[in-house]
UniProtKB/Swiss-Prot annotation:
Enzyme Commission number(s) from the entry: 2.1.1.45
Source organism: Mycolicibacterium gilvum (strain PYR-GCK)
Residues bound to (6R)-5,10-methylene-5,6,7,8-tetrahydrofolate: H54, D172, A265
Protein name: Thymidylate synthase
Protein encoded by which gene: thyA
Binding residues annotated for dUMP, in chain numbering: R24, R129, R130, R169, S170, A171, D172, N180, H210, I211, Y212
Active site residues of this protein: C149
Protein localization: Cytoplasm
Annotated Gene3D superfamilies: Thymidylate synthase/dCMP hydroxymethylase domain
Catalytic activity, as annotated: dUMP + (6R)-5,10-methylene-5,6,7,8-tetrahydrofolate = 7,8-dihydrofolate + dTMP
Function comment: Catalyzes the reductive methylation of 2'-deoxyuridine-5'-monophosphate (dUMP) to 2'-deoxythymidine-5'-monophosphate (dTMP) while utilizing 5,10-methylenetetrahydrofolate (mTHF) as the methyl donor and reductant in the reaction, yielding dihydrofolate (DHF) as a by-product. This enzymatic reaction provides an intracellular de novo source of dTMP, an essential precursor for DNA biosynthesis.
Length: 266
């Protein structure tokens, strides 16, 4: 069975039909507004194969989010530097993803652990249409080093299988989106395991889907490569969603094409 290539198809679509736009970084982009990709999580783990993706950074970043952390020191100690450009001299990023996921502040001074609440709801009421986690806290965006790009996700259960849909307001297609697809696919597997469910789909919905002008050459090279079969995820059993370690996440048979370097737009 041929490997599904929704990500590569989106790259090609934006390259061919994207609208030239200016952007906050001053780099310039080709952009398309509104697109959806679907990945069957039973057909392999959706880690892009047309270039090598740094899986260590993906796994540690997700564990960092689940810790409720917003300081890059924990990542740096594990050799992950993907957030360094936005951090303060002390490593702080403000109330970014992990803080909102685990400790959303309420007007009464309490804090909501959205991940725990989502998992509890999966167990109590799997048919709920309210199982949503949001990082887009309007009142705290000015304090964030970078407003959330992957802002909002929803869980859905059908036939004993858990699916997740992410809304990503701003999608750096070459550098960022391969990370985001794999990260939320991994989170879906973790949540499903904790709720006693199988996995269904990961659905990615993008707002401003863009290729930076200084990534066009790299994207063209990537699209010249034939996609390979997706790898397999093996997740060790854990008692809590917050107990997972890097060693618990094993990605087998990942045989991608070589990595392609590109500058980050800050």
């Amino acid at each position: 069975m041929p490997t599904a290539t929704p990500y590569e198809d989106l790259l090609r679509l934006v390259l061919d039909t994207g609208t030239p736009k200016s952007d906050r970084t001053g780099t310039g982009t080709r952009s398309l507004f509104g697109h959806q990709m679907r990945y069957d999580l039973n057909a392999g783990f959706p880690l892009i194969t047309t270039k090598k993706v740094h899986t260590k950074s993906i796994v540690y970043e997700l564990l960092w989010f689940l810790r409720g952390d917003s300081n890059v020191r924990w990542l740096q100690e594990r050799g992950v530097t993907i957030w360094d450009e936005w951090a303060s001299p002390t490593g702080d990023l403000g109330p970014v993803y992990g803080v909102q996921w685990r400790s959303w502040p309420t007007p009464s001074g309490e804090h909501i652990d959205q991940i725990s609440a989502a998992l509890d709801l999966l167990k109590r009421d799997p048919d709920s249409r309210r199982n949503i986690v949001s990082a887009w806290n309007v009142g705290e965006i000015p304090q964030m080093a970078l407003p959330p790009c992957h802002a909002f996700f929803q869980f859905y259960v059908a036939d004993g299988r858990l699916s997740c849909q992410l809304y990503q307001r701003s999608a750096d297609l070459f550098l960022g989106v391969p990370f985001n697809i794999a990260s939320y696919a991994l989170l879906t597997h973790m949540m499903a395991a904790q709720a006693g469910l199988g996995v269904g789909e990961f659905i990615w919905t993008g707002g401003d889907c863009h290729i930076y002008d200084n990534h066009v050459e790299q994207v063209t090279e990537q699209l010249s490569r034939d996609p390979r079969p997706y790898p397999e995820l093996v997740l060790a059993p854990r008692d809590s969603i917050f107990d997972y370690t890097y060693e618990d996440v094993v990605i087998k048979n990942y045989e991608p094409h070589p990595a392609i370097k590109a500058p980050v737009a800050i």
